[in-house]
Amino acid sequence: MSRIGKLPITVPSGVEVTIDGQDVTVKGPKGSLVQRIAEPITVEKDDDGAILVKRPDDERNSRSLHGLSRSLVNNMVVGVSQGYQKDLEIHGVGYRVQQKGSNLEFALGYSHPVVVEPPEGIEFATDGPTKLSVKGIDKQLVGEIAARIRKLRRPDPYKGKGVRYAGENIRRKVGKTGK
């Protein structure tokens, strides 16, 4: 039995879960999300309001999808009730970020400013010229947008300059030694 998949999902107050066949819809104070669950897995509501994710058999495919499906539904419940946030930091001389409306404008050492537009359901917030955060209800989308921003100028292993996640440790390399 999957250690993650067998755990029931508690639904906080103010969150409504609707199960329609393989489609699970979660509505909460921050918005609503829809997820289609893979075929052998079933999602049911318990008598006390908890959500149970079950698998029909112990085949390899069912086992692999069991924990995944439970995590996807749990991430939806947490997203519509609390939301997700990913913080990023910018290191380097002259590297900075500026909020222009809902967009972010980066100065990252290129000959031009880099503008990033938020997709639907994502908000950007800046805290000074070197700190920013990506917020939203969809965990996958928040992580993807944060990774795209980090990819604009990945941290340099020699000087540590670039965009990194808050608290991320960059493995530094020693430069070549002169004679």
Swiss-Prot record:
User: One MF term from GO for this chain?
Assistant: structural constituent of ribosome
Record PROSITE patterns? RIBOSOMAL_L6_1 (PS00525)
Q: Which GO terms describe its cellular component?
A: cytosolic large ribosomal subunit
| Keyword Membrane in record | no
Q: Name one GO biological process term.
A: cytoplasmic translation
* Coiled-coil zones: none
Query: Which function does this protein serve?
Result: This protein binds to the 23S rRNA, and is important in its secondary structure. It is located near the subunit interface in the base of the L7/L12 stalk, and near the tRNA binding site of the peptidyltransferase center.
Q: Write down the HAMAP family for this protein, in alphabetical order.
A: Ribosomal_uL6_B (MF_01365_B)
- Family assignment from sequence similarity: Belongs to the universal ribosomal protein uL6 family.
Q: How does it assemble?
A: Part of the 50S ribosomal subunit.
Q: How is this protein named in the record?
A: Large ribosomal subunit protein uL6
The primary gene name is: rplF
